[in-house]
Amino acid sequence: MASEMSKNVKVTDDQEVTSQERDQSGGTKVGGEEEIAPLARQSSILSLTLEELQNSLCEPGRNFGSMNMDEFVANIWNAEEFQATTGGCKGAMEEAKVVDSGSGSGDAGGSGLCRQGSFSLPLPLCQKTVEEVWTEINQAPAHTSAPASALQPHAGSGGVAANDRQVTLGEMTLEDFLVKAGVVRGSFTGQAAMGSGMVNGPVNPMQQGQGGPMMFPVGPVNAMYPVMGDGMGYPGGYNGMAIVPPPPPAQGAMVVVSPGSSDGMSAMTHADMMNCIGNGMMIENGTRKRPHREDGCAEKTVERRQRRMIKNRESAARSRARKQAYTVELEAELNYLKQENARLKEAEKTVLLTKKQMLVEKMMEQSKEKMNANRGGSQLRRSGSCMW
């Protein structure tokens, strides 16, 4: 019975891919996928539904609806760290390699097995509960998310979601909930793998860093922020993802090591590339580089530098003017002192000449008086003792 259900799920999946993929997945290879594919899907926490996570993580009597988004994300990452430390990530990566060597479609489950990088919640979303976020998602216009949901199946559901009924909170996968809530830009697991399968067919995870297409987010994709097309024939945008071929790696450059690989030399998965790009990083020749600053920041820096140069020039001009004024003032004072000194010297000469003349005149008067005195003592006096 379980084998028949798995075959029905596989037939539904084959209806969404090209005829070439349908031919490659036929024959004796279907039996291997019936046993491996469900394990690869369930190995990623993002492909589990909220009801399954609630039954495995929450305490009895408590559900995700009463938690705020901070507690909800913290519980998710704690569970994922526990899964990574127990070796689940490594085992699932080996399963994905077996599927790829057998059927050529193993990247559908292997792209999300490695632990995803953590992200920061927007400030308005931190204090809201899960129920409030779900209510806002349902209140958003239906036409914004209809094209994206019609183009792709829900991750981990095993088929295309029915469009005639409303999906409940418990039936939604963790990945879809985070995307629709606006916490992350794009999908972590299924969407990147589907993009590579629809354009260039199945891609081996070992070759994704060399020749496989890379998925880049072109805008926020959720129920509240729609994407207005991506130039590939999809009116609503293929979940906000643009598929572009990556540049070939340089000779001698090491490929980025995947944290979940068994041999330590496998190529970086699509999910890791998405996390690096979403966190503002660029991947070039196997290394991570920060993006260049925007032109606006460079223009502001140049304007600030020019204003500083103008201020420095004005300050230097004011300093030179002050020094020149001080020098002119000192020169004027020196000239005044020189003129005053010359005037005082002339006055001193005049006073000395006046004193000298007065002294000469006084000496002449004294000499005259002395001469007069000498003249008066030598004259004969008339005698009155005898008569003539």
Curated annotation (Swiss-Prot):
Induction info: Induced by abscisic acid (ABA). Induced by salt stress. Down-regulated by cold and drought stresses.
Residue runs in coiled coils: none
InterPro entries: bZIP (IPR004827), BZIP46-like (IPR043452), bZIP_sf (IPR046347)
Tissue: Expressed in roots, leaves and panicles. Expressed in seeds.
Result of changing S120A: Loss of transactivation activity
Intracellular or extracellular location(s): Nucleus
Primary location class: nucleus
GO molecular function, a single term: sequence-specific DNA binding
PROSITE patterns: BZIP, BZIP_BASIC
Name this polypeptide is given: bZIP transcription factor ABI5 homolog
Organism (species): Oryza sativa subsp. japonica
Gene name in the database record: ABI5
